[in-house]
Amino acid sequence: MSKQAVITMENGQEIKLELFDQDAPNTVANFEKLANSGFFDGIVFHRVIPGFVAQGGCPNGNGTGGPGYEIDCEINPNKHERGSLAMAHRGPNTGGSQFYIAYAPQPHLDGVHTVFGKVVSGMEHVDEFRGRDKMASIRVS
């Protein structure tokens, strides 16, 4: 069975995710380590572009930060569809902690960014994001 994650927002809303640990094992392991250590607690979705993506995971809150290391891309057959969870990066093999949830299919990102999960419930909460929406926590089990 795939790993599951829950993003609990500051307002109590939950976004439940299925993680693709068979297709992106190192990316999922990194996300799990960061999540369960509390790295994401209190971090905002700093980049919200309706019709494109909601991006979070930057400890600086502006898209410039990360965990202090980089991970390799794990390109796989999963596509960027509505609700896809993927790693943000500034070039190949430069991911770390920043991730995004796609609002709509983004075929131009397929084969470029690692898709490592999908929203299974709570996408309506992501649809309500307006920017600077704060995560209380992310936990992976």
What are these regions (language model features)?
Residues M1-S141:
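Cyclophilin-like peptidyl-prolyl cis-trans isomerases
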